[in-house]
Amino acid sequence: MTDTTTTTTTDANKLVLEKSANSSGLEVDLHPLVLINISDHFTRTKVQSNYQDNCRVIGVILGVQNGRNVEICNSFEMVYATVDKQLVLDIEYLRKKYEQLFPLYDLLGWYSTGSQVSKDDILLHKQISEHNESPLYLMLDTDSPKSKDLPVIIYESELHIVNDEPTTIFVKTPYKIQTGEAERIGVNHIAKVTPSGSEGSGLTSHLFTMHNAISMLNIRVKALSDYLQAVKEKRLPYEQNILRKASSLCNQLPTIDTHDFKKSYLQEYNDVLLVTYLASITKTSASLNDTIDKYLVSNEKQSKRRFYQ
C-alpha cells in the first residue's frame, strides 16, 4: 500500500488507472469471511430500505500487514452521515469499535459496494487515510450475480500529477483468496445450499415448491371437506362415485394406531424426558457448585481478616 507521486497525462476525470501488473509489489490475501460480512451487510441494508436501487454500504477492512504482504481477515460496518452532499465517517465510532473488538488487527482500509469508482470514494479514502497512510479500497459489485469471476476489485492509491495538480488515483491490485479451516467449512455449506451460477438458493427453491404443494393440498382437502359437509346437510345431492373416491383416498392414509407404534413412541418420549431431566440436574449441580465455591472463597477471606486482626 503505497502512494507514488508521478507525472502523468491522465484525464482529470479518470479515477482509476488500469495497469497490467502490480507496480508496488503488494501481495494481498483475501479471506472469504470479509466477503460474507459485506454480502450480509448489503443484504440487510437492502431489505431495510425496501429494496431501493441506490443501496450502498460502507465499512472498514482489518487484517495483518507484514512488509509488502497484506492479509485481509475481517471487516465491520461503518457509521456515516451526509453533510453538504458529502459522506462523512463517524471517526469516534470507528476508533472505539476498532480498539474494543479488534485490538490484534491492523486497519488496512475500507470497503463499499458498487460497480464504479466515484469522486465520493476519493473523499472517503482521504478520511480513512487519517488512520492508515495508504489504505486499501475493496469494492464488491453486487449487480453482477451471474458473473463467473469474483466481483471484487481491490485498489491501492497513488498520487499523480494531473494538470499540474496532485491527484489521488486508484490502481487495481491483484489478490488471491486465502481460507482457514472454519471458513472452508462455511463456504462449502453455502456452496451446497446455493448452486453455482444460480441467482436463487436451492433451499429457497425447495421450500417454495413445498409451500405451493402444501397450499394446493390444503385447498383440495378443504373443497372435499366442504362437499362432504354439504352432502351431510343435504344441500348437495348424494353422489356414490365421489364418495367412493373420497373413501378410497382416506383408506390410503397410513394406519399407525398400533401397539408397536405406541410402545415405540412412549419409549422415545420417555428418553427425551430423561435427557431433559438429566440436563436440568447437571445445570442445577453446576450452579450449586459455583455457589459453594463462592461461599468458600468468601469464608476464607473473612478467616484471614480475623487472623491478621
From Swiss-Prot:
This is COP9 signalosome complex subunit 6. It holds the Pfam family JAB. Keywords: Cytoplasm, Cytoplasmic vesicle, Nucleus, Signalosome. One of its GO terms (cellular component) is phagocytic vesicle. Belongs to the peptidase M67A family. CSN6 subfamily. GO terms for biological process: protein deneddylation. It is found in: Cytoplasm; Nucleus; Cytoplasmic vesicle, Phagosome. It comes from the Eukaryota. Although strongly related to metalloprotease proteins, it lacks the JAMM motif that probably constitutes the catalytic center. Its function as protease is therefore unsure. Its main location: cytoplasm. GO terms for molecular function: metallopeptidase activity. Signal peptide: none annotated. Component of the COP9 signalosome complex (CSN), a complex involved in various cellular and developmental processes. The CSN complex is an essential regulator of the ubiquitin (Ubl) conjugation pathway by mediating the deneddylation of the cullin subunits of E3 ligase complexes, leading to modify the Ubl ligase activity.
